[in-house]
Amino acid sequence: MGEENQPNYTISQENWSLHRKGYDDQQRHQEKVQEAIKNNLPDLVTEESIVMSNGKDVVKIPIRSLDEYKIRYNYDKNKHVGQGNGDSKVGDVVARDGSGGQKQKGPGKGQGAGDAAGEDYYEAEVSILELEQAFFKELELPNLKRKEMDENRIEHVEFNDIRKTGLWGNIDKKRTMISAYKRNAMRGKASFHPIHQEDLKFRTWNEVLKPDSKAVVLAMMDTSGSMGIWEKYMARSFFFWMTRFLRTKYETVDIEFIAHHTEAKVVPEEEFFSKGESGGTICSSVYKKALELIDNKYSPDRYNIYPFHFSDGDNLTSDNARCVKLVEELMKKCNMFGYGEVNQYNRHSTLMSAYKNIKDENFRYYILKQKADVFHAMKSFFREEAGEKMA
């Protein structure tokens, strides 16, 4: 073959899938991070760096489930022979722990000094939004109903379409650049310029109508002297996530914050999450304040009403009968009543002893004994009801 007939190109036989290895590893790593977030949610939702943040920051959290394959040191220093007899099969055991049934040494934990290696963990940067997406996915307000005189249809705009014409303010730069690159590459010059009219892509919106109904949540918290630092932190952690859940998932929901000791008062949100008080405990005062708010501001004919009360259960014994009566009165006007009790050491609770006699499907309670119970309390109070639709 002459020189003039020699091809001016070469065909590569290279395995091009190897060029995606970095991208594939990155995707696999991100999937493992998301899986770790999901598996560690009960502990993550009460991380102080998250609860005390402004809700917008990216926070670093330890995720210990991202173990990579590695050669580990044999702490017992057993000697093994590396040569086989040649007839091994897939799945055969190649070595066993030679410690004679004793537990093998591992990474050191607990108090005191030691000589064992530590346990590695990955400190991932996670945004509040990522946690919310994993946490709120299966939560909803229970028994939500349509109410009279409501604007039951909410309009909002979604950018869910791409067109070749539109407003310059809505141009999709990424899709436009990709379109130009593809067209130029087909002409033998792989570059992002020039950009022609045919390359332009515009994001276009549609008005979406969805049914909705007004709701009010009454966040009631015991701030008496018996509520210590840990008890108040647990209660505020629950209300922190409850508030974010409601504002993320529902557009027409009001939240009233009520703090109480022997007396109850409506307080601003900032004060509810930061101010500490002392004194005795009369829980009936907060239920009276809730009924007062409902009568004056939130008619059951127009609102779905959800009271949530958190306390340590250490109530004045003579007040318990009044509490039960007022809770039953509240439930006649509400869609659901939730009571959360922070009781770390499983001590006797005068209030819970009285509430266990309430037989009503709209009364829900949860006892929180450890930080992870904030997650489980949210799942219990806001669980999805099978087949439940807005009536």
Curated annotation (Swiss-Prot):
Chain intervals with Basic and acidic residues compositional bias: 21-31
Polar residues composition bias: residue spans: 1-16
Bias (Gly residues) ranges: 98-115
Domain of life: Bacteria
Start and end residues of each stretch annotated as Disordered: 1-31, 80-117
Family: Belongs to the UPF0229 family.
Entry-linked HAMAP family: UPF0229
Protein name: UPF0229 protein BCA_0588
Native organism taxonomy: Bacteria, Bacillati, Bacillota, Bacilli, Bacillales
